[in-house]
């Protein structure tokens, strides 16, 4: 009984301490004698698509005030009205949030991610300026900002606000020209999920094939961490490193990946299988002088649906890197318009004209790919070849029909 009572007392005291600590996050006044330590937290990627790129937080620790908070940008809610539509449109507003340090670690422990902590050697004046700026950001009128996937996200905002707090000449190595492109970094982040990688490749244009800009726009959390690790600052003639040695404060959970049949059906496997199937069906059509309406209906439907998404992004979205996508040449809504004519009699002339124009457009696509900076990938080439074969097959069958008549 005595052990139970002791355990109960300990739990109550711990809960009280945690509650007091959390309350202090929102009610902290700094005195001149208070010491502030600052560090950068970098979380590794998670399993959900919005977790694939990791996360960044700024830890502010004021022991005398029992303040141990993490400010982090990039908060959003799926419950916001029309969130999905606004996200595709590029009109989503993200927020800055504040969590207790231990809650931050718990959140990522549940997710299975690792967290690294990089101590930043800010002076007390700089730390106070940073803390004041973060607190000002937390005001309701300043809490939200317009999200940009490449240029204004959870990795860029911490870099910007810390930079504004520094007093001295910041020195960063800008001689490295062998920098990765945005697309390369995206592939590194989503590499385990081939379908996510393929989907993003379809939607993003040549802007993502430009090199990232250091130290201005890091794009990803681990790049922000790297920037601070390689930064020096000249304070009154004394050059010092801005950061210490990073340490892992939370280890990633090693989950056993369960392989399913779908795991082996990668976009490339699917594309090659489709190409082989299309070749076999097309050969049969040419021999029998007929058209497989079901085959074309399925293929045209998929291309048309994806085409609606691609053209919506191209014409209406405010997101960067979607407004000059050459995939719009072969993924477009016109495929859907053509489908009814496949099943209507006496529409051969219309379909012949469409396929003739489409044949020229698909050939032009292969030419454009050579000269533009956008990397479309081997999967797209295989899929476009399948479409080209369907178009050539239709034109060939119709020509044979004319000769038979």
Model-derived features: positions:
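Core alpha-helical transmembrane segments of integral membrane proteins
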Residues: 231-320
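Positively charged n-region of N-terminal signal peptides that target proteins for export
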Residues: 1-7
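Glycine-rich catalytic cores of cysteine/serine-nucleophile enzymes that process amide/ester linkages
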Residues: 34-113
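Boundary at the C-terminal end of the N-terminal hydrophobic targeting segment
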Residues: 21-25
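Generic detector of multi-pass transmembrane helix bundles and their immediately adjacent loops
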Residues: 279-286, 293, 301-405
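Active-site nucleophile-His-acid catalytic modules used for acyl/amide transfer and hydrolysis
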Residues: 104-180, 382, 386
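Soluble non-transmembrane domains of integral membrane proteins
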Residues: 150-222
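Bacterial N-terminal signal peptides
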Residues: 7-16
């Amino acid at each position: 009984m005595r052990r139970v009572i002791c355990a109960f007392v300990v739990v109550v005291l711990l809960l009280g301490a945690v509650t007091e600590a959390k309350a202090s996050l929102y009610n902290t006044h700094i005195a001149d004698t208070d010491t502030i330590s600052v560090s950068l937290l970098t979380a590794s990627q998670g399993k959900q698509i919005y977790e694939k790129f990791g996360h960044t937080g700024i830890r502010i620790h004021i022991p005398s005030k029992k303040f141990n908070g993490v400010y982090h940008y990039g908060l959003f809610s799926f419950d916001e009205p029309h969130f999905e539509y606004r996200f595709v449109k590029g009109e989503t507003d993200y927020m800055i949030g504040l969590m207790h340090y231990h809650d931050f670690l718990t959140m990522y422990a549940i997710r299975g991610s690792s967290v690294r902590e990089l101590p930043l050697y800010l002076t007390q004046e700089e730390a106070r300026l940073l803390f004041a700026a973060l607190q000002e950001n937390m005001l309701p009128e300043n809490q939200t900002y317009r999200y940009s996937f490449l240029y204004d996200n959870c990795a860029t905002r911490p870099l910007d606000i810390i930079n504004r707090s520094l007093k001295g000449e910041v020195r960063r190595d800008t001689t490295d020209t062998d920098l990765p492109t945005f697309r390369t970094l995206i592939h590194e982040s989503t590499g385990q999920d081939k379908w996510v990688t393929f989907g993003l490749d379809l939607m993003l244009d040549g802007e993502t094939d430009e090199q990232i800009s250091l130290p201005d726009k890091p794009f990803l959390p681990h790049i922000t961490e790297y920037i601070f690790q390689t930064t020096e600052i000249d304070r009154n003639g004394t050059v010092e490193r801005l950061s210490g040695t990073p340490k892992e404060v939370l280890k990633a959970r090693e989950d056993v990946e369960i392989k399913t049949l779908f795991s082996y059906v990668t976009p490339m496997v699917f594309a090659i299988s489709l190409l082989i199937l299309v070749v076999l069906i097309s050969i049969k059509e040419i021999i029998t002088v007929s058209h497989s309406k079901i085959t074309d209906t399925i293929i045209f439907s998929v291309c048309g649906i994806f085409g609606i998404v691609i053209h919506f992004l191209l014409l209406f979205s405010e997101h960067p890197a979607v407004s000059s996508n050459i995939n719009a040449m072969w993924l477009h809504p016109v495929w859907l318009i053509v489908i009814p004519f496949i099943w209507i009699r006496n529409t051969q002339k219309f379909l012949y004209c469409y396929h003739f124009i489409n044949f020229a457009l698909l050939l032009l696509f292969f030419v454009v790919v050579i000269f533009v900076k956008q990397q479309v990938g081997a999967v797209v080439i295989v899929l476009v070849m399948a479409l080209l074969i369907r178009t050539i097959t239709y034109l060939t069958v119709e020509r044979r029909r004319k000769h038979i008549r």
